[in-house]
Amino acid sequence: MKKIHPSAVIEEGAQLGDDVVIEAYAYVGKDTKIGNDVIIKQGARILSDTTIGDHSRVFSYAIVGDIPQDISYKEEQKSGVVIGKNATIREFATINSGTAKGDGFTRIGDNAFIMAYCHIAHDCLLGNSIILANNATLAGHVELGDFTVVGGLTPIHQFVKIGEGCMIAGASALSQDIVPFCLAEGNRASIRSLNLVGIRRRFDKDEVDRLSRAFKTLFRQGDLKENAKNLLENQESENIKKMCHFILETKRGIPVYRGKNNA
């Protein structure tokens, strides 16, 4: 059963799933699609052409789907946001819609946890089970792989790609691509080690050991792309293949830290 506060504004054409709760002074725009068991809390705003998956929570004064902060954007362009299931979007977070430079949509996968005051700009592509801590700021066209964590107060430059299972430390500033399963920190951020906490949660000890050896082979010395090419030969681990292909395909470069690594 839907529960909609009398002061909430629901525009014509909005599609609301079963058991949706919309609290006081919330706004839901036209052509939105709100899944089952979604809660939109007091004062939150869901703008036109936004899709939010089942069992999600949008907290007070978050704004999802407003127009891009891009001076080339024209209002007549098709533009929206697509968010998967089980998302948590905390207070004052902002998620902008996409532009014609992408496919018109900013996209976020399932199980996202987006903390207070985070900003996700136009055309970002975020995978499943990502976490953005308070005040993390993603510029346009940033891509995050599944299971990636971005620490609080960390800005990420436009077009940066962060691979699966990464950890970006809090109060860092990132302007280059980060290889899957790695931890980066600093201003400017560079790769310091494997994200051991993250990979131990997901993989068995044998795979963790293989990834640790691969990290040392890739990053300790020599040319990074040559190391990746050599490591790919007869490689059986799919996760190590992901690391190597990412290195070979990067467009913004990989920030390599040549000091003491912990993996």
Curated annotation (Swiss-Prot):
It holds the Pfam family Hexapep. It catalyses: a (3R)-hydroxyacyl-[ACP] + UDP-N-acetyl-alpha-D-glucosamine = a UDP-3-O-[(3R)-3-hydroxyacyl]-N-acetyl-alpha-D-glucosamine + holo-[ACP]. It comes from the Bacteria. Gene3D superfamilies: Hexapeptide repeat proteins, Udp N-acetylglucosamine O-acyltransferase, C-terminal domain. Homotrimer. Belongs to the transferase hexapeptide repeat family. LpxA subfamily. Involved in the biosynthesis of lipid A, a phosphorylated glycolipid that anchors the lipopolysaccharide to the outer membrane of the cell. It comes from Campylobacter jejuni subsp. doylei (strain ATCC BAA-1458 / RM4099 / 269.97). One of its GO terms (biological process) is lipid A biosynthetic process. SUPFAM superfamilies: Trimeric LpxA-like enzymes. It is found in: Cytoplasm. This is Acyl-[acyl-carrier-protein]--UDP-N-acetylglucosamine O-acyltransferase. GO terms for molecular function: acyl-[acyl-carrier-protein]-UDP-N-acetylglucosamine O-acyltransferase activity. The gene is lpxA. Its EC number is 2.3.1.129. The keyword Acyltransferase applies. Pathway: Glycolipid biosynthesis; lipid IV(A) biosynthesis; lipid IV(A) from (3R)-3-hydroxytetradecanoyl-[acyl-carrier-protein] and UDP-N-acetyl-alpha-D-glucosamine: step 1/6. Keywords: Acyltransferase, Cytoplasm, Lipid A biosynthesis, Lipid biosynthesis, Lipid metabolism, Repeat, Transferase. One of its GO terms (cellular component) is cytoplasm.
